[in-house]
Amino acid sequence: MQIFVKTLTGKTITLEVESSDTIDNVKSKIQDKEGIPPDQQRLIFAGKQLEDGRTLSDYNIQKESTLHLVLRLRGGGKKRKKKTYTTPKKIKHKHKKVELAVLKYYKVEDDGSVKRLRRECPNCGASTFMANHKDRLYCGRCHLTLKLEN
């Protein structure tokens, strides 16, 4: 019987085969006509890839059926090298949660009055305290720095 093999270029090859022929035999006949090695050939019929050991009758390939020939692609994408860093990673600052942190900012005097332990920022207003350094006061919000005189 006669079958057709359509290549990717659109060229159609005619092959004389029997329904008992294996897919290996068909691929070797394509190699004789086109010069493509059988290990690079993939034959597709009715949306299925044809396996080498099976026969044409296994796939219900009859006379004047058309097989599609595509080439097998070898391998995958290029592997990327893993980046090597010259300097070690910087350790992230861990935030320490302090229970009842408000107690650091105020003190209750013996007479019952409340005294502020830290100075509030004159630019930012109430509830923004300045950090105490050994020679200065610093506001972390507006970056105001006040120098202390001893």
From Swiss-Prot:
Residues 1-76 form the Ubiquitin-like domain. It comes from the Eukaryota. InterPro entries: Ribosomal_eS31, Ribosomal_eS31_euk-type_sf, Ribosomal_zn-bd, Ubiquitin-like_dom, Ubiquitin-like_domsf, Ubiquitin_CS, Ubiquitin_dom, Ubiquitin_ubiquitin-like. A zinc finger (C4-type) spans 121-142. There is a cross-link at residues 6, 11, 27, 29, 33, 48, 63 (Glycyl lysine isopeptide (Lys-Gly) (interchain with G-Cter in ubiquitin)). One of its GO terms (molecular function) is zinc ion binding. One of its GO terms (biological process) is protein ubiquitination. Pfam families: Ribosomal_S27, ubiquitin. Keywords: Cytoplasm, Isopeptide bond, Metal-binding, Nucleus, Ribonucleoprotein, Ribosomal protein, Ubl conjugation, Zinc, Zinc-finger. GO terms for cellular component: cytoplasm; cytosol; cytosolic small ribosomal subunit; nucleus. There is a cross-link at residue 76 (Glycyl lysine isopeptide (Gly-Lys) (interchain with K-? in acceptor proteins)). In the N-terminal section; belongs to the ubiquitin family. In the C-terminal section; belongs to the eukaryotic ribosomal protein eS31 family. NCBIfam families: PRK00432.1. Ubiquitin is encoded by 5 different genes. Ubi1 and ubi2 are synthesized as a polyprotein with one copy of ubiquitin fused to ribosomal proteins eL40A and eL40B, respectively. Ubi3 and ubi5 are polyproteins with one copy of ubiquitin fused to ribosomal proteins eS31A and eS31B, respectively. Ubi4 is a polyprotein containing 5 exact head to tail repeats of ubiquitin. This is Ubiquitin-ribosomal protein eS31A fusion protein. It comes from Schizosaccharomyces pombe (strain 972 / ATCC 24843) (Fission yeast).
